[in-house]
Amino acid sequence: MQHLFEKLFRAESMSQEESQQLFAAIVRGELDPSQLAAVLISMKVRGETPAEIAGAAQALLADAQHFPRPDYLFADIVGTGGDGTNSINISTASAFVAASCGVKVAKHGNRSVSSRSGSSDLLAAFGIRLDMSAEQSRLALDDLGVCFLFAPQYHTGFRHAMPVRQQLKTRTLFNVLGPLINPARPPLALIGVYSPELVLPIAQTLKVLGYQRAAVVHGGGMDEVAIHAPTQVAELNNGSIESYQLTPEDFGLNRYPLAALQGGMPEENRDILARLLQGKGETAHAAAVAANVALLLKLYGQENLRHNAQQALEMIHSGQAFDRVTALAARG
């Protein structure tokens, strides 16, 4: 292990295998706090490479609790958090709407990073159990088209890094790992990142990790597809990556100010999204979810973004998406 420390302190990059070896030791609790802090800061200052991020993700996936992976096509829709916008839970709402559109979503998430209420805070407010077993979650995915995998339940090794992360009070590699370590190992993913500089590196990381098709997005300061500004996209499709920009108009949607997506505490967000998913919500909220669902549906081969957004809006207005929420809560 010492030779890897020396390599990092010389500002040299690790190979994917070296990174996997190092992070396997981290999740086993084999590094003391000062060593872990030194590793994370040296990587942050130099800038983590896609190979290093992929190696770290593979170490955490190897250490994760088993999830019975289905043989059908399914996706994750998840953001890094940490964008500081305190918006409503767009990706969580999008998962339920996408399921209502007929695709399968195994959403990996955690408690809040950037907003006052992360995806699991919101789901708990809806009465959805966070400690559902892997088998129960798989059945929900089969039957309802949506399940939620609570990160701390599957990634117990994360706890070894938590005290150091809290003391450092700065973003580290762990801030981008969350979306990459879904224990269900989805072949498709829509991943939002907190910085435009991360869009291409995370897409390159997804390629290394073997994703079939994925899109990494950052829109006007948000780790989502934006409806107030252009969205930067890096799309991975069978090994090749294409970078492009999307505007709300590409989805056939109007623009809305970022302030229109302001969220609140978990109970407030629950009420906002309950109204939205029952077809009684704000038009800006519906548009934001429709844009994200539209890009997710594209990963399934539905290439027409305007058509996809319209399909999502129709599903939102029908109130069918909320039926998935109540059905998932009823499985508690």
Curated annotation (Swiss-Prot):
Q: Which GO terms describe its molecular function?
A: anthranilate phosphoribosyltransferase activity; magnesium ion binding
Q: Which residues bind Mg(2+) 2?
A: 223-224
Keywords annotated in UniProt: Amino-acid biosynthesis, Aromatic amino acid biosynthesis, Glycosyltransferase, Magnesium, Metal-binding, Transferase, Tryptophan biosynthesis
Where along the chain is Mg(2+) 1 bound? 91, 224
Task: List the catalytic activities from the record.
Answer: N-(5-phospho-beta-D-ribosyl)anthranilate + diphosphate = 5-phospho-alpha-D-ribose 1-diphosphate + anthranilate
> EC number(s)?
2.4.2.18
The subunit structure is:
Homodimer.
**UniProt name for this protein:** Anthranilate phosphoribosyltransferase
What is the organism of origin for this protein?
Yersinia pseudotuberculosis serotype O:3 (strain YPIII)
